Each structure stands twice: as structure tokens, then as C-alpha cells.
């Protein structure tokens, strides 16, 4: 398992302790440069974003563009946008835990959320290869769809 990114120092220290105790081999890659990130995505089968708060998770789109299946938290606004803009994308959605505020989960819900994530990862790994066309998530393709929506909202007739 490859874990990318880096939170604050306390969070990272906790992650290091958890990975040291894990039965699963874990590599903590930290922050990756763009070319390293693309190589990491392309060598991976599944990208997991167990987030509690997101606007538009661009990392998910990057992972899809590199051919990954995705497991992500089903956050308000994200799933409808992804399904409308990227129909057929290989994304498995996991219900979030209850939240005590905008980005703090209810502690009692975390074991069930973690189990649901593990099940979704296993499901994604066991699924046949996706037929999703990664060019659907190129910058040009995404921008074209966004411009079309903006134009239609303004009463135009884009494209």
C-alpha cells in the first residue's frame, strides 16, 4: 500500500505509528512531485480518498485519468457532479460517518466507516478492469463540459 500526502506533524506521527503496527506493508511517500504522482497513480489499481470534507476532489479526477479505480467518501455535491460529468467512471462510494462539525467525524461511527472503506476497496480490487476511457477526464474534456454547462446556464448554445 502506498500512502501519499502529508497532514500536520501530529497527524503524520499517528499515521507512522499505525503503519508500523499494520500487517499490511505500507510505504509513506509523503508529498510527491507531479511526475512521481503520475507514476504512482499508473502503478496502482485503486485510489482511495476517505475524506470528510471536499469541494471538487481533483485528486480523484487525476487518479481516474491515470487508469485507477476509485473509492471515495460520498460527500454532498461530489457524487452528483462526478456522475454527471464523468458517467461510467469506476468509482465506489462509501457513506460518510456522522459529523460533529464540518470536518470532524463522530468517533463512534469510525469503525463502521473504516469497515465500509475496507469492503469497498476489496470490491474495487476484485472488479474486472474498467472500460472507462481516461481521456474523458483530460483537462480539455473536463473544461469543455464545464464551459458547456456555464454557457447553457447563461442561455447560450455552446458547442
Regions found by a protein language model. Name each.
Residues 1-13, 28-31:
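Glycosyltransferase donor-sugar binding loop
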Residues 31, 39-44:
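Short alpha-helical donor nucleotide-sugar binding micro-motif in glycosyltransferases
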Residues 45, 67:
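A short alpha->beta transition loop at the rim of the catalytic pocket in nucleotide-sugar-dependent
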Residues 52:
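Aromatic "clamp/platform" in nucleotide-sugar-dependent glycosyltransferases that forms part
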Residues 57-60:
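Short glycine/serine-rich donor-binding loops of glycosyltransferases
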Residues 69-72, 77-79, 83:
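Short hydrophobic beta-strand element within catalytic cores of glycosyltransferases
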Residues 105-119, 125-154:
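A charged, aromatic-enriched C-terminal amphipathic alpha-helix characteristic of glycosyltransferases
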